[in-house]
């Protein structure tokens, strides 16, 4: 998708469709200009209440041919009605407007469109013109996603390829361009994560993820990628990771990405993604119902790759390291058994009480590996526990941290992008649930506070740096009729990295 921001006249800009706005029952400048050319068509529609006053409502209009007209369709979009003078457009309005408009444009079989913003929002404050441009570009990108493997008429490719954001002056052009660039980059990153998440486990293997990282790095001089195999991990003493991958015919991979967009002396942020490309539960086998959704157990890894995709698109001025712990969790004669004791890279021993609590086993060695980068912060992202879904449902990711400033920054990023998280306790009181008679710790802590004890387990490997854990089990994918990966929390992560 190409986004262009420029100053233009609605009478002379060549495009298939012009998008104009109304607010408080009145046409905005470009809509009013179009109305004059169309002999009162738009004001007539307002007078008969053909468009709802609800923010995001829209009305398609077929335009009468004129001498100067270079477009045949118009889309009139409602910004909403203020109930009182102090009320204005809210962040929620911006999101609704953008989602509805993006969906409408992508389903209209248009090749291009032009959006006339007409200073619809102020340059400063919570709800700005840049925020509207950012959100609209992101939602247009998101609405354009089609799963690559699905064939047939139900998967018609999106036709919209170019959107012009039209400004009224040069300052507004810059504002719209900035908003469109960040929104489009985030949207591309989200879609990349969705695609990886949606791929079946027979295609998206640990090696496939490593190849995707390699391909992404090939297109950017600031990004490098490499992958460690099981022999290299064995030499590093990654017994926890290998206890998971050894049950599968697919070799486990520790995938490493380094994006160097800032000065070399600036400490990097590190993102650690759980990449269990299919999780059967191992010997502690999961029930058959809905097991197909365990292909989504690598959505943490997908979000890391999606975030790097966005950073590359933005040419971001930050240093970021990505570590993806990629493995399959399969039952076999070589798989780990309940009661096995393994030694992690940190030297701590773990009694594997349940082989279906495998995510923390691959992550703990990856978190230990992260120490070598002397990071500014480390954020791990994982579809870690069903207990988090019980606690928070499908709207907020669970957030745990050993450093409140990092937690606050992530919470703020989530609020700003509507990719929200909720901070959970990480108290020492929960640590004793991990006690083991045969090792330094067990890999599960019982049913009470299951998401918390999983985070407590990880915290034992993060003593040397500021760390946060995002449990995305409830937000990484949708089930049911709209089954599919969401691409979360790419927008949260990108916002966090750009602002910290």
Curated annotation (Swiss-Prot):
Q: Which cofactor does it need?
A: Mn(2+)
Which Gene Ontology molecular-function terms are recorded? manganese ion binding; metalloaminopeptidase activity
Enumerate the Gene Ontology biological process terms.
proteolysis
InterPro entries linked to this entry: Leucine_aapep/pepB, Macro_dom-like, Peptidase_M17_C, Peptidase_M17_leu_NH2_pept, Peptidase_M17_N
Q: What are the GO cellular component annotations?
A: cytoplasm
Q: Which UniProt keywords apply?
A: Aminopeptidase, Cytoplasm, Hydrolase, Manganese, Metal-binding, Protease
List positions binding Mn(2+) 1.
279, 356, 358
CDD domains for this protein: Peptidase_M17
Enzyme class, top EC level, equals: hydrolase
Binding note for cofactor: Binds 2 manganese ions per subunit.
Cite the active-site annotation.
286, 360
Where in or outside the cell? Cytoplasm
Recorded family membership: Belongs to the peptidase M17 family.
Q: What is the documented function of this protein?
A: Presumably involved in the processing and regular turnover of intracellular proteins. Catalyzes the removal of unsubstituted N-terminal amino acids from various peptides.
Q: Which protein is depicted?
A: Probable cytosol aminopeptidase
* Species in which this protein is naturally found: Saccharophagus degradans (strain 2-40 / ATCC 43961 / DSM 17024)
Source taxonomy: Bacteria, Pseudomonadati, Pseudomonadota, Gammaproteobacteria, Cellvibrionales
